A protein has these predicted regions:
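Oligomerization/assembly interface segments of phage tail-like spikes and tubes
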Residues: 83, 87-107, 149-162, 223, ...
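Short amphipathic beta-strand and strand-loop transition segments with alternating hydrophobic
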Residues: 77-89, 137-145, 400-406
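Short, surface-exposed secondary-structure edge patches
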Residues: 106-113, 201, 373-379
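Acidic, small/polar-enriched beta strand-loop surface segments
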Residues: 1-73, 221, 225, 230, ...
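N-terminal assembly/attachment segments of tailed bacteriophage virion structural proteins
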Residues: 56-57, 61-66, 70-73, 80-92, ...
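Surface-exposed cap/loop segments at beta↔alpha junctions
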Residues: 2-16, 34, 44, 87-88, ...
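Well-ordered beta-strand positions in beta-sheet-rich domains
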Residues: 69, 130-135, 153, 323, ...
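Charged- and aromatic-enriched interaction segments used to assemble
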Residues: 145-279
Length: 436
């Protein structure tokens, strides 16, 4: 058995888009409805005549033409996916997930009915699970010297991009000043009625009113930052808005730099790890901007922002360091000050494994392992908890982003990580009666 006949991504993955149902009916500016063949004052032989012959209205596509999921995997030569969050210290911000497809000339987007904004998904046919779900943001066709040299590129984004495009003009409860964290999240999501979302973990925290005019994504970032949580788009295209990251293993994965077994169901031997340390990256100052609001003398709500500052003089003197700036909705100055101090304490001054890469499929992976490895890799989500082993030392980390680089014959996955111990503000919001 050669490498090219062994189990490979092309056997297991399917890329699909929602496209118009292709029939033998006439389609705008294509084939029989090509504008160059329209009626003219002098009608040459073979010209289309309205409601006659090939232009008979009975053969037109109706305005309510159906669409369906269409498989476009065949011509694809490279697929890359990236989903997850970005980090600033211990704070996580949602990042738009992307899918990029490169394909050969056999994929003609116009002929296939593929349009800007159409839904697109990459899924694993073995377990039926999606790896990415989103919508097309760009289609590019680059003609070559020969027709067969034409290159097609399709770009797509996930639901985070839609949320980032929505402007939200503040948020406050119907009565009173503070409101429950989950109530605020649901209030914010009222600005995106067609976006599916879930709240897998909630918080007892209260948040302040705000008149902050910014994107809905920035409001969600501030809400989750206030409780040490995060939000992201999952593989099905649904937003997951979490007060805190998962505390249990989902995929039972261990990432190790050795070839020893770890006791985990899936032991991934990573081939490349990033664990760098630079003095200028040490956080020596935290500035937490609270986007508060209060009524003026006329009863109109106005911005009452303030900044909570925490400084570590020893770090600043020894290393110089950097300033971490975040947006929050803390309910009081006391909580804001405590948050800033907590983030400063959580800032690491030692190197940790921040990224690893491994291969579900390559020439070095045994054929009988490939299907299971592809199944597991495709299920990885941001915030998943994993065990990381480096030079014999074990630690727990949350995945902050997952990237897949896939060809018909190979699959490389890269994960970025954040140590578990630097996440969360459990000490600030302790119960439903907490008033701090």
């Amino acid at each position: 058995m050669t490498f090219y006949t062994q189990t490979k991504p092309a056997d297991q993955l399917k890329l699909e888009v929602v496209a118009a149902v292709v029939t033998d009916a006439m389609r705008w500016d294509i084939d029989r409805w090509d504008r160059s063949r329209w009626d003219r004052e002098e009608v040459p032989a073979g010209t289309l005549i309205f409601n006659a012959g090939m232009w008979n209205r009975e053969k037109w596509i109706e305005e309510t033409a159906l669409t369906k999921w269409v498989d476009i995997t065949g011509p694809c030569t490279h697929i890359s996916v990236k989903r997850g969050v970005t980090t600033a210290g211990s704070i996580m911000y949602a990042h738009t997930g992307t899918l990029s497809v490169k394909a050969a000339a056999e994929l003609d987007p116009r002929a296939a009915g593929i349009l800007y904004g159409a839904q697109i998904r990459l899924k694993n046919t073995r377990n039926g699970q999606p790896i990415f779900t989103g919508f097309i943001t760009d289609i590019k066709v680059e003609p070559g010297k020969k027709a067969s040299d034409t290159a097609v590129t399709i770009e797509a984004a996930d639901t985070v991009a839609k949320v980032a495009s929505i402007t939200r003009y503040g948020a406050r409860p119907d009565g009173g000043r503070l409101e429950n964290w989950e109530s605020r999240v649901r209030r914010l999501m009222g600005s995106a009625p067609n976006v599916a979302y879930e709240i897998p973990s909630t918080s007892y925290a209260l948040v302040c009113p705000t008149v902050w005019e910014t994107s809905l994504a920035a409001h969600l970032d501030a809400a989750t930052a206030t409780v040490g949580g995060a939000w992201y788009c999952d593989r099905q295209g649904t937003l997951q808005i979490c007060a805190y990251p998962p505390q249990q293993y989902k995929t039972n994965v261990a990432l190790t730099d050795s070839y020893e077994r770890t006791g985990k169901i899936d032991t991934w031997h990573y081939t490349d790890a990033k664990a760098t340390w630079q003095a200028e990256n040490i956080v020596s100052r935290v500035e937490a901007t609270v986007h508060d609001a209060a009524p003026n003398d006329s009863g109109e709500w106005r911005a009452a922002d303030y900044v909570a500052v925490a400084v570590e003089p020893t770090r600043a003197t020894a290393w110089g360091g950097s300033t971490l700036k975040i947006d929050t909705l803390a309910p009081s100055r006391f909580i804001a000050d405590e948050m800033a101090q907590t983030m400063l304490k959580e800032a690491l001054d030692y190197p940790t494994v921040s990224a690893v890469a491994f291969w579900p499929v390559s020439q070095r992976i045994d054929n009988d392992q490939r299907q299971d490895r592809m199944n597991t890799a495709g299920l990885i989500d941001p915030l998943d908890l994993v065990e990381v082993i480096r030079d014999g030392d074990k630690s727990l980390a949350h995945i902050t982003s997952v990237s897949h680089d896939i060809t018909p014959y190979t699959w490389k996955t890269t994960l970025t990580l954040l140590p578990k111990e630097v996440i969360g503000f459990e000490n600030l919001f302790t119960g439903p009666n907490s008033t701090r």
